[in-house]
Amino acid sequence: MSRYEASDIEARWQKAWEEAAIFQAKEDHSKPKYYVLEMFPYPSGKLHMGHVRNYTMGDVIARYKLSTGHNVLHPMGFDAFGMPAENAAMASGGHPKDWTYSNIDTMVEQMKPLGLSLDWSRMFATCDPEYYGQQQALFLDFLEKGLVYRKNAVVNWDPVDMTVLANEQVENGRGWRSGALVERRELTQWFFKISDYSDELLEALDGLENWPAKVRLMQENWIGKSRGLQFSFERTDGEEAIEVYTTRPDTLMGASFVGISPDHPIAKKLEAESQEVADFVAECRKGGTTEEAIETAEKLGYDTGLRVKHPLDPNWELPVWIANFILMDYGTGAIFACPAHDQRDFEFATKYNLPIIPVLEPVEGAGELTEAYVPTKAEKVRYVRGFAGDELQTGEEGVNTAVDKAEAEGWGQGVTKFRLRDWGLSRQRYWGCPIPVVHCPDCGVVPEKKENLPIALPYDEDGKAIDFSVPGNPLDRHPSWRNCACPNCGKPAQRETDTMDTFVDSSWYFARFTAPRAETPTDLDAANYWMNVDQYIGGIEHAILHLLYSRFFARAMQICGHLPESAKEPFDALFTQGMVTHAIYENAERKDDNGRAIYHYPSEVEERDGGVFVKETGERIKVIPSAKMSKSKNNVVDPLAIISTYGADTARWFVLSDSPPERDVEWTASGAEAAYKHLNRVWNLCDRIGEMDPDAKGEGDEELLREMHKAIRDVTLGVESFGFNAAIAKLYGFTNTLSKSKASAAVQKQAIKTLAQLMSPMTPHLAEDIWAHQGGEGLIANAAWPVADESMLVEDSVTLPIQVNGKRRGEITVAKDLDKAEVEKLALAHEAVQRVLEGAAPKKVIVVPGRIVNVVA
């Protein structure tokens, strides 16, 4: 019997696929098209098991669709711009471009052994000038259509590194790299007008039936449509009133103070007049700028001394506070605070000893408030200081009646607002797509001409290497790149040195794959043929920003003529896979020099004597339950090591078999070993059947064929519904049946070839080898998917339970169409029934065809 040599088999069939170019997609209008896409990776230089699981899922779908007669597009590329490359250049003195392309080469070499059915001829990286040049063309088209604009915006500014920081780069108010106190600085930034599409993006979610409900809900909440009241508080000093927007006008009678953002015009005026206010506002500008960062920061306030009049009682005056938790870019930058029913306001009022006035309470009554009472708008509550509607009503009813009252009395207006803000795309970074505009002293901001694209990044400073360790954006200090002629008047001008947010790069790549070498952003004919993406696969962490931005981009590209109307929703179906996890191995006997835990790689430990120990030192290990694979915890498994030991098919089989794909899967050495043993078993089964006399007769042909067609039915259903683990469970069962079968050689040969076809999306190399050994025609990757014979799925026999006086005594298997009288005879002849009857005749026998036999003794 030959040995299952995974490495030889896999290399041989990968070469065969490449030579046959069977995965290179070409337009073919005689077939239905199918576009499957996994979210493309960042080129970190290291493939991990999460990648393996993600790409294997997509590969199963792609191979299945190819075998069912579809023309499949299954491309791969790299999301290659971003900070890690600049950070690597800072650390090593290298160049982001060299680091990135080296990592891409490495990752391609790591991916290819997996045997993925990818069209590598379409590969690109977003840092390719050919790609980002077309992205610059899109920017210019968007600018022409009014979808891009400039405005001042508050950003996180690192005064040492002299750059804008993303919120996640601000740690405890300091820059993550420099350690400098971060400032909230106002800079001129470029924005996409995504907020113009808030309603459309929200309404269209209902049509995304093949997206997970939780993703649609996350996007709905992010877009954040709300109906509220906009009104003004008159100032007691007679100056301009303070306009506020609230989604809970029903709590207005619990107003304690009016809060304004540190960036509100009133705050800015006071800042210019008072050093004390200026110092306070400067303190507020330390830390992040997102809602999340502000929400978790300590609540800070400053009493301006200004007072306003309550709109329902001119004798009721409220203080005006500057508060660090109020955002200028939501609503009006001013709020009225009701501490009794907003936790943020409650914490602020408690800290500064401001009134807390309950307006509503649970229907059953309330005790002393120790935190804000914040019921949902759907809950019915008791209004104890209401001013509109009934005493008992839902919050939503209270809001609506409050808005109606304000409008009727003329002091407020019902307004619908969205949480979704315009998308700021400016980044003060080198390693990104340059924004294609020029600043001219005479003409102002001028779009670059398309014939001058791409505006490529300079590799060096006119022959001198760029020093990435110097703070700031290298493009700002470049001796020549920044200088150019104005596209409008031809006079000396300067290029924009900001680059685009890397989310821009990933917001249209799916469209570029349809014609990756086109000299325009898309080829409309190719886009018409291939779009939409039929199946998109990726992590839940991209549920909001990437997917929302892509939906916006598809609409903008359609407006500009780069996509058809039908592609406004670019992803027909979305699947979000779970993570690959692994146990964490913490050294139980010592810490590092800084007192921190020491974690060991799985390859460094061994199980023995009822415990887990470090192989080299024998130190005891504390095993922490499975968690997401993480370099910081060393609980990572190298896919290449697994492929080297067991083969790619084993890795593919295991990540698909052990858990439903939407859930996490725990990687274990024993699980991988079990998967490998099973594939060996299938290989040996193929060998055994191949050695049979082709004319050998047997018994049980029909039974084996029936099980084969059941397997076809069940595996097909599993693959089509993303139930890969269920499909594999059926394949285990069918393998067991075949290994025990005594059917004829011809039927067993048919069964093993069918087994190979059913396994081919999951274990394509092994399947190809079995197919070839059993005389299959051509490549199994090109073979038509087997179709279950419905007549073979109809059972000829049925097993009926027998009950005597209501108690189950046994069962009989009979022909499905057997006469009732014959069924009764067989039931009464059953040994267990005879023991109960003790020779007496039964009082009654009831035969329910196909279900049960009831005997009354």
Curated annotation (Swiss-Prot):
**CDD domains hit by this protein:** Anticodon_Ia_Leu_BEm (cd07958), LeuRS_core (cd00812)
Q: Which family does it belong to?
A: Belongs to the class-I aminoacyl-tRNA synthetase family.
- Gene3D superfamilies attached here? 2.20.28.290, 3.10.20.590, HUPs, Isoleucyl-tRNA Synthetase, Domain 1
Gene Ontology cellular-component annotations:
cytosol
Motif mapping: 'HIGH' region: 41-51
Does this entry carry the keyword S-adenosyl-L-methionine?
A: no
Membrane-spanning parts: none
List the InterPro entries. aa-tRNA-synth_I_CS (IPR001412), aa-tRNA-synth_Ia (IPR002300), Leu-tRNA-ligase (IPR002302), Leu_tRNA-synth_edit (IPR025709), M/V/L/I-tRNA-synth_anticd-bd (IPR013155), Methionyl/Leucyl_tRNA_Synth (IPR015413), Rossmann-like_a/b/a_fold (IPR014729), tRNAsynth_Ia_anticodon-bd (IPR009080)
Q: Which organism is it from?
A: Ruegeria sp. (strain TM1040)
What's the gene?
leuS
Write the protein's name: Leucine--tRNA ligase
Q: Tell me what reaction this enzyme catalyses.
A: tRNA(Leu) + L-leucine + ATP = L-leucyl-tRNA(Leu) + AMP + diphosphate
| Record localization | Cytoplasm
What is a single molecular function from GO for this protein?
A: ATP binding
